[in-house]
Amino acid sequence: GKRAIEDHFDKATELEAELSQRGKNDLLKAVQEIIPKNVSCVYVRQPQALGLGHAVLCALPVVGDEPFAVVLADDLIDAETPVLTQMASLYGRVGRSILAVQNVGREETKRYGIVRTEEQSRSPHRIGGIVEKPEPEKAPSTLGVVGRYILTPRIFHHLQHQTAGTGGEIQLTDAIAALLGDEDVFAYEFEGVRYDCGSKLDYLKANLAFAVKHPEIGAEFRGYLKSMGCTTLGNEKPARS
């Protein structure tokens, strides 16, 4: 249910006591380190499913007048340096909103927010426009926005003053388009491999990709796959998203 995420990251006092009593110190350590000691979790409910922009707007009382990150869980990115770390480093240089993007192929543009960039230079690109899910023949580029954003608090102004669309939804893409009238927004082509875990096939690919690199069971799992006739398997160190 809705409390699953809260329960997962909550302190499990009874479980910790049980693991300690049984001397299962490795498991106890793993449970205790789910959340770093300097991190506090705050949860905000979206009372109605009124679009991604509305969900972001629900966080305004918590975020306030600070830059913040948006992470969409469907997009799992296998990267040696976590993509948000890459983007935070860039934010430290430009001090403006940043959208993670990747080339999605012309036929896939109708599944993404697509950006128009002002330069043809290397990433990061200054964004000149953004449109939600255009048909391939109308797409300004093939750079699609994926589920990692760093946004300045100015975005809340545009979310609050946006005219709701179909079904009363408030779209983040529309607010970003309006934000372009106030300040620069950058598109960042990240380093890493993205899996769209809203897709059944990509979900399975992600499980396989992470399993063969798992520090505990990776070697055994690769052996199992080899026994099934799979010969092209990775053996890289674990990556992070």
Residue ranges and their predicted role:
Residues 211-241:
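Generic C-terminus detector
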